């Protein structure tokens, strides 16, 4: 897991063309917001959305929410102008769509020299090149684009996301190998709370830092699922205490609840506590 000073349990897409949605986002319980200029904006609204979002980011206070701008691709008529407009914007990262190889990030890096870059992982080629992409020195985050990936694969939706497992796993491996944040794809049925919870739990258990969301109604479940539970925090504290006590007696392992606790378990326990502390700090900010 990447060491984060900021949680990414809930990452909400907001269309850059919708002024009311941009205003409402100030009060939402999202850890991060993706201000979208790409898929969520119609072609005839692209230029308006760019201007509206630029002004909004300059004038609206989103508190400590992590602000990500998803631009249009460099192969479109809007991509370069998007990057030029937001190169020095009040954003925390620029999200590049449909990254298929590390070279896709080079032109963007030149136009946006100061902001961190995130990559949308949503093509078959991107899955196969995930390690190369994750190694790019400017990249700090990955976002799974499961809708576009499903379209490219020609796969049908199943609750276990069987067709997605290979791609999700490759991107997770790449992100963890290079210390990146990585968030899972969206769940389209925003009124299906049971289905959303199950998919959030699957993503959490796989190792994702959080989930991208398409509707504010999904925030509560994502935040809950991707937060360490009181039981997990209590266990982490007991594991650390038992291991430190064992070390004081010259032992390299401890036993907690009938299970061996080694150094690798302590690393995980400390990560659990660090995540809980980051969430608490974010809530208090």
From Swiss-Prot:
Which annotated residues bind Mg(2+)?
122, 148
Cofactor field: Mg(2+)
The organism's place on the tree of life at top rank: Bacteria
Q: Which reaction does it catalyse?
A: (S)-malyl-CoA + H2O = (S)-malate + CoA + H(+)
Is Kinase among this UniProt entry's keywords? Answer: no
Q: Which GO terms describe its molecular function?
A: hydrolase activity; magnesium ion binding
Q: Which Pfam families match?
A: HpcH_HpaI
What processes does the entry annotate via GO biological process terms? oxaloacetate metabolic process
> Where does the signal peptide begin and end?
none
Ligand binding (substrate):
70, 122
Q: EC number(s) on record? A: 3.1.2.30
Q: Which residues cross the membrane?
A: none
**Swiss-Prot/TrEMBL keywords:** Hydrolase, Magnesium, Metal-binding
PANTHER family assigned? CITRATE LYASE SUBUNIT BETA, LYASE BETA SUBUNIT, PUTATIVE (AFU_ORTHOLOGUE AFUA_4G13030)-RELATED
What the record says about family reads:
Belongs to the HpcH/HpaI aldolase family.
Question: What job does the chain carry out?
Answer: Catalyzes the hydrolysis of (3S)-malyl-CoA to (3S)-malate and free CoA. Inactive towards beta-methylmalyl-CoA and other CoA esters.
Quaternary structure annotation from Swiss-Prot or TrEMBL? Homodimer or homotrimer.
This chain belongs to the protein called (3S)-malyl-CoA thioesterase
Species: Cereibacter sphaeroides (strain ATCC 17029 / ATH 2.4.9) (Rhodobacter sphaeroides)
* The encoding gene: mcl2
């Amino acid at each position: 897991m990447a060491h984060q000073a900021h949680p990414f349990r809930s990452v909400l897409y907001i269309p850059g063309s919708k002024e009311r949605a941009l205003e409402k986002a100030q009060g939402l319980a999202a850890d991060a917001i993706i201000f979208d200029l790409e898929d969520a904006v119609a072609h005839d609204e692209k230029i308006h959305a760019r201007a509206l979002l630029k002004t909004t980011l300059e004038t609206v206070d989103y508190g400590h929410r992590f602000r990500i701008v998803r631009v249009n691709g460099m192969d479109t008529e809007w991509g370069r102008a998007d990057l030029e407009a937001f190169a020095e914007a009040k954003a925390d990262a620029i999200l590049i769509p449909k990254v298929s190889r590390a070279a896709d990030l080079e032109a963007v890096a030149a136009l946006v020299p100061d902001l961190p870059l995130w990559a949308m992982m949503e093509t078959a080629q991107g899955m196969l090149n995930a390690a190369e992409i994750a190694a790019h020195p400017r990249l700090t985050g990955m976002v799974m684009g499961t809708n576009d990936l499903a379209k490219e694969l020609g796969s049908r939706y199943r609750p276990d996301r069987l067709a997605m497992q290979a791609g999700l796993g490759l991107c997770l491996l790449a992100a963890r190998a290079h210390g990146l944040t990585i968030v899972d794809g969206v769940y389209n049925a925003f009124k299906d709370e049971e289905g959303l919870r199950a998919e959030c739990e699957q993503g959490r258990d796989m190792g994702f830092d959080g989930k991208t969301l398409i509707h504010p109604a999904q925030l509560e479940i994502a935040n809950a699922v991707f937060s360490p539970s009181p039981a997990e925090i209590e266990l982490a504290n007991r594991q650390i205490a038992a291991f430190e006590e064992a070390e004081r007696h010259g032992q390299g392992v401890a036993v907690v609840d009938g299970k061996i606790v080694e150094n690798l378990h302590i690393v995980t326990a400390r990560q659990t506590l660090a995540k809980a502390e980051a969430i608490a700090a974010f809530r208090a900010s």
